[in-house]
């Protein structure tokens, strides 16, 4: 699963996801992509599950690019622990995704297979998404 090799700080604030994506909104690598339509935190597990579903649907033909990276640690406290006594330890990593962000890109497969593969990948994600194509494709 994806996670940073090293970070400046061990724990991070929760924060909020405001506004639309500034960068990463256009297809840069592949011919087809999956675009986020709502703000959400996507975990490394969800990204990996989606990637596996896409590559399996493509029967390992073509190429897949992951355009988001989980760089935010999420900390949790153990079950049945009283409030207070500090913040919990980091448990997993998430990527903050804003609307308009391209999540995955693929190429090297027919348009109908690309649509089907990205639909299977989108089912593994906690957000509404949209299938996008490069101008002139399909």
Curated annotation (Swiss-Prot):
GO molecular function: rRNA binding; structural constituent of ribosome; tRNA binding
Gene3D superfamilies the record matches: Ribosomal protein L10e/L16
Domain of life: Bacteria
Annotated Gene Ontology cellular component terms: cytosolic large ribosomal subunit
UniProt keywords, alphabetically: Ribonucleoprotein, Ribosomal protein, RNA-binding, rRNA-binding, tRNA-binding
Pfam families for the chain: Ribosomal_L16
Example GO biological process: translation
Known partners and oligomeric status: Part of the 50S ribosomal subunit.
Role this protein plays: Binds 23S rRNA and is also seen to make contacts with the A and possibly P site tRNAs.
HAMAP family to which the protein is assigned, alphabetical: Ribosomal_uL16 (MF_01342)
Entry similarity comment: Belongs to the universal ribosomal protein uL16 family.
Protein name: Large ribosomal subunit protein uL16
Organism: Gluconacetobacter diazotrophicus (strain ATCC 49037 / DSM 5601 / CCUG 37298 / CIP 103539 / LMG 7603 / PAl5)
């Amino acid at each position: 699963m994806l996670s940073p090799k090293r970070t400046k700080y061990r724990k991070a604030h929760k924060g909020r996801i405001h506004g639309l994506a500034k960068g990463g909104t256009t297809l840069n690598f592949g011919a087809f992509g999956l675009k986020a339509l709502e703000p959400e935190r996507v975990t490394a597990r969800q990204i990996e599950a989606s990637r596996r579903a896409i590559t399996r649907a493509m029967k390992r033909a073509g190429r897949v690019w992951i355009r988001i990276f989980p760089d935010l640690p999420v900390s949790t406290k153990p079950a049945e622990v009283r409030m207070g006594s500090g913040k919990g330890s980091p448990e997993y990593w998430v990527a903050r995704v804003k609307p308009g962000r391209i999540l995955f890109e693929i190429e090297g497969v027919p348009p109908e297979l690309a649509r089907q593969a990205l639909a299977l990948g989108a089912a593994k994600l906690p957000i509404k998404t949209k299938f996008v194509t490069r101008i002139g494709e399909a």
